[in-house]
């Protein structure tokens, strides 16, 4: 019997969170980003994985470049992970990069920066971008936002 080998990978993830209940698994929410990633992994490989994200986004929030770490307990390459997720994930979640990392690397501690962007439309937005901002149909006092 061989020794079980634990491997860690850094993920860079982009997602449209419109149809999700946020990043983190929740008892009363069926559709979360991490839940979708973990269940897709299990469907592809028949085994569970552990995923930790650098941030927990709320329901409906999007991310470009969310850092996460996946822990697996079998020998697999970043390329194999990428192919499986690219094939099975819904189109609103994309793994942009997968790299092996040591068990010392942690997404919460080692993320170098976080940028939050809020988009407010003061005119009715185009339907192709409307879900990525908030429409405010009154005068906007920018000084109160800073």
Where are these regions (language model features)?
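Structured-RNA-binding interfaces characteristic of tRNA pseudouridine synthases
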Residues: 2-146
């Amino acid at each position: 019997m061989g020794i079980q080998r634990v491997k860690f990978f850094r993920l860079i993830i982009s997602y449209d969170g419109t149809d999700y209940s946020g990043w983190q698994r929740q008892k009363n929410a069926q559709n979360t980003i991490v839940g979708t990633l973990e269940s897709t992994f299990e469907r592809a490989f028949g085994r569970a994985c552990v995923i930790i994200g650098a941030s927990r986004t709320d329901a409906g929030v999007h991310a470009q470049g969310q850092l996460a770490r996946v822990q697996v307990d079998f020998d697999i390459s970043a390329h194999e992970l990428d192919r499986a997720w690219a094939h099975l994930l819904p189109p609103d979640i994309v793994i942009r990069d997968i790299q092996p990392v040591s068990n010392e690397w942690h997404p919460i501690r080692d993320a170098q920066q976080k940028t939050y962007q809020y988009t407010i439309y003061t005119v009715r937005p185009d339907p192709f971008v409307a879900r990525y901002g908030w429409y405010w149909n009154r005068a906007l006092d920018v000084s109160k936002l800073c």
